[in-house]
Amino acid sequence: MSTSPTEPRSRHPLLVWAWSLLRLKFVGVAFGALFFCLSLTPSLLPRDWLFQGLIGGVNAAFGYGLGVLIGTTTYRVLLRNARWWPPSARVLFWMKAAVVAIAPTACVLMLIPAASWQRQVSALMGIEGPTTPGYLRTLIVAAVVGALLVSTFRVLIDAVRLVARMLIRRWHLHDEVALFIGTAIVVALLITLIDGVLVRGFFAVASAVSQPQDSATPSGVSQPQLPERSGSPASLAPWDTLGYQGRDFVATGLHAAELSRLNGKPAKEPIRVYAGLHTAPDDPGRSDVLVGELARTRAFTRKVLLIAPTTGTGWIDPVAASSLEMMYNGDTAIVGLQYSYLPSWISFLADRQKSMDSGRLLIDAVHDRWEQLPPDHRPKLVLYGESLGSMAGQAAFAWLPDVRRMGFDAVLWVGPPHESPLWRALIVRRDPGSTEVRPRYDNGRTVRFSEAIDPADVDRLAGAPWVGTRVLFLQHPSDPVVWWSPDLLFGRPDWLIEPRGRDRSALMGWNPVVTFWQVSADLTNAESMPGGHGHNYGNDILDGWAAVAPPDGWTAGDTERVRAALQNPGSARS
């Protein structure tokens, strides 16, 4: 009797195995659809169809796996010995048919309000949202991503079974013991593969991509000739050692003549000193060069000395630097130190301790030299940090009193990552009744937090006047850098329970696992938001400086004059 080509025994074993990867468990499909629908709910920032498809696929795959686990456990614990299980073939057919019909229909229908939700979030950011027809493409991406993840997991399960069968044949082990050992072996191999190959390979590729960029020079930027700048012919830090961001920092900004026109009185040439990765072999050597640069440029005779730990790439926000220089009419010195050329999020994953060690070393080196000066001949000592630079700066202080003890006049930390040690400690110990998004600590005497709504927001939540050192955190309610944490996987944070901030959707909630991946996706889009939203603080930084480090006699009108110059840089140069 001939064998039909459609019968399973006529197929090649590899084809049978490959086809088995596509066969789905119906309980898993139901949970996968549920988690996909939950992933469509709004988060901190707008998501286009591609990002939503990625997040939807990841969450659908997790939901599928959870559903399979629940279904299998329920069968083994409750149903295997039940008299009424399994139901009749007819009932089982209609149960499966219902899942097949309802799951995809629910996913498609949920995309319609999801597009509307994204338009609402986009409106909060001041940008245009997606169209509903265009957003339907989300389902295609999610299906592909989900299928790949589920298939990958099934391959791992098959690998465990293969190892278990080998152990049973070779050592005659009990099934459960063989499965346990097989799982341990596959997990160990998987961890080795991920940590030893994939992760290291990712960082190696990131380094290979970023290093040439760091060796380049920004378009339109040339070596400074003024001795007040690192990289100049008179500098101890050669131009070609400063890195991409360092060269941009020392070669840009307003000069004395432009500041004089802006402020209507003679200005000083701002001092900008910087050390790149190639300026010296290590951080201590680079710090020594910077202290030498500060002495060479007579930076300690200026009105303000600003220490600015950089972000991962070595970037110092030009708004932070220029606004302070405008406020003090050039009577300033700014010092920065590069510790990496990788983007901040990669530096954070690769070695966040490196940024903290570098920041601590920079602050200690400059502070030690500053402290040697007679008290009445010291400049105002000011600290600034944005994003990973904020985390680097906080590493220099075990607790808040250390900031005052070291003699800092003002500290401005912008968009601190959630793992920042001092920020987290202050949030945990905030005054009773204040929220995580708008916290208050010690009635705002030394440290304050602002959403950067307007210039007056810094004082709005304070219950007492400033006392001594002024420390200010700027944190947008929509900034995922501030709010992302692994804790989002299984814990609802206070900021998602309390009243929302000004630019966070009222529709955002918390769902286990789902919210974690949503906010993770928001991280990739955080800096592309308009100023005042996400991780783009723009001219909000000026309001921060006006709050913590205003020159004598500074007024709200002066702040607006500088703001106009920041918004129209050409006006000061004309």
Predicted region positions:
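Short, Lys/Arg-rich, polar N-terminal cytosolic tail immediately upstream
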Residues: 1-20
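Gly/Ala-rich beta-loop-alpha elbow adjacent to hydrolase catalytic centers
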Residues: 383-390
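C-terminal His-loop and adjacent cap/lid subdomain of alpha/beta-hydrolase
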Residues: 14-379, 399-574
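Short glycine-enriched nucleophile-adjacent loop
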Residues: 390-402
